[in-house]
Amino acid sequence: MQIAEKIILCTHGYFSEKLKESAEMIAGPMDDVTTFCLLPGMEPDDLKGQIEPLLASCSAAVALVDIAGDTPLNVMARLSAQYPVTVVTGVNLPMLIEASESRTDMDYQELGTHLVSMLPSTGRVIQMKGAEK
């Protein structure tokens, strides 16, 4: 079994840093999570250059990105052709906490599948009585 040695959090703006800070408020320190921020004016190759040394230094990783079809995903997809990394889109707070807590319980590819399977359960519509019309 090849576990995810690292969790990569790669998003637009500072979302990844703030998401990690919020997760740590709930679950404690997440030393296994490294954040990467795509900032205005940054080229995809700049982001790739920041992430690649981390991937080169670990046995396997899971990368959590914010949205499908944009630069963070595209960069991680390119890197996944060279390194053992599973890329998951749609990162949210419950997913990050689950990734950190389950990282050593399953293979890095299984972890990616597990994280995607939990997406439907992380959103709910709550209607309070006062909202009725």
For the regions a protein language model found, what residue spans apply to each?
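N-terminal loops that bind phosphate or other acidic moieties
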Residues: M1-L64, A68-K133
